[in-house]
Each structure stands twice: as structure tokens, then as C-alpha cells.
């Protein structure tokens, strides 16, 4: 098929993987009803009649807590494989993990010092 014959199946997989979502979106666009008024513009609240407007302002502090959570959630994702392979990796990997944790603790201390974790 092309210059690397061992990768024909992989190229076919990539083409199919790209074509399936595009085909699904095009099919949806062609077959979906075209109504743009009425209940489609209302906010969905678990089958109940909507109360109030859909646009409300959230306190920015929610976003700060979410960012801190995401940072430490990603830390957990990176440290779990390291912990599983701890015996095989040796001292250098342990030092690298300590540096990684130290950098994140500095970020936490900075956020704490700036008052990002205060709710007053």
C-alpha cells in the first residue's frame, strides 16, 4: 500500500478510526430534526420545568479549588505507575519522584500563601 508494508493494517485502522466519527456526525446532521425554537432553547433540569435562567455566575473560588484538585489528581496519575514499579526503578527514579512532589508542594504552598484556598 505504501513504503512501509508492515504498517498497512495500522494505516487502515487510522483511516477507519478517523472516518467513523466523521460519518456519525454527518449522519446526525442529515437525519436530525431542524427545529430551532421552543423547548429546545430551555435548560434541561431532570424533566422538571426550569426555574430561573440558565446563566448564573459562579464564584471564582470554585475554579481555584478545581484547579488545585486537578493538579493533585494528575500527580496521583503520574505517581501510581511509579509506585507499582518502585522495586525495579531504583534510587534515581525515587529522587525524580521526590523532585516532582517537591515542585507540586511548592505550587500548593504558593496557592495557599496567595489565599486561593481560603473561603471567606
Curated annotation (Swiss-Prot):
Membrane topology: Multi-pass membrane protein
EC number, as in UniProt: 7.1.1.-
Gene3D superfamilies: NADH:ubiquinone/plastoquinone oxidoreductase, chain 3
GO molecular function terms listed in the Swiss-Prot or TrEMBL record: NADH dehydrogenase (ubiquinone) activity; quinone binding
UniProt subcellular location: Cellular thylakoid membrane
Pfam families linked: Oxidored_q4 (PF00507)
Superkingdom: Bacteria
Positions of transmembrane segments: 6-26, 64-84, 89-109
Keywords: Membrane, NAD, NADP, Plastoquinone, Quinone, Thylakoid, Translocase, Transmembrane, Transmembrane helix, Transport
Keyword Transmembrane: yes
Reactions this protein catalyses: a plastoquinone + NADH + (n+1) H(+)(in) = a plastoquinol + NAD(+) + n H(+)(out); a plastoquinone + NADPH + (n+1) H(+)(in) = a plastoquinol + NADP(+) + n H(+)(out)
Main location: membrane
Xref: HAMAP family: NDH1_NuoA (MF_01394)
Subunit structure: NDH-1 can be composed of about 15 different subunits; different subcomplexes with different compositions have been identified which probably have different functions.
Entry function: NDH-1 shuttles electrons from an unknown electron donor, via FMN and iron-sulfur (Fe-S) centers, to quinones in the respiratory and/or the photosynthetic chain. The immediate electron acceptor for the enzyme in this species is believed to be plastoquinone. Couples the redox reaction to proton translocation, and thus conserves the redox energy in a proton gradient. Cyanobacterial NDH-1 also plays a role in inorganic carbon-concentration.
Protein name stated in the entry: NAD(P)H-quinone oxidoreductase subunit 3
Record organism: Synechococcus sp. (strain CC9902)
Amino acid at each position: 500500500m505504501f513504503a512501509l508494508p508492515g504498517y498497512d493494517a495500522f494505516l487502515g485502522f487510522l483511516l477507519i478510526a478517523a472516518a467513523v466519527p466523521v460519518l456519525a456526525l454527518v449522519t446526525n446532521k442529515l437525519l436530525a430534526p431542524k427545529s430551532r425554537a421552543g423547548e429546545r432553547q430551555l435548560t434541561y433540569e431532570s424533566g422538571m420545568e426550569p426555574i430561573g435562567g440558565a446563566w448564573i455566575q459562579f464564584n471564582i473560588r470554585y475554579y481555584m479549588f478545581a484547579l488545585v484538585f486537578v493538579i493533585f489528581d494528575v500527580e496521583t496519575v503520574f505517581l501510581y505507575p511509579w509506585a507499582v514499579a518502585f522495586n525495579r526503578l531504583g534510587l534515581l527514579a525515587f529522587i525524580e519522584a521526590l523532585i516532582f512532589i517537591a515542585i507540586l508542594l511548592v505550587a500548593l504552598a504558593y496557592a495557599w500563601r496567595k489565599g486561593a484556598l481560603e473561603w471567606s
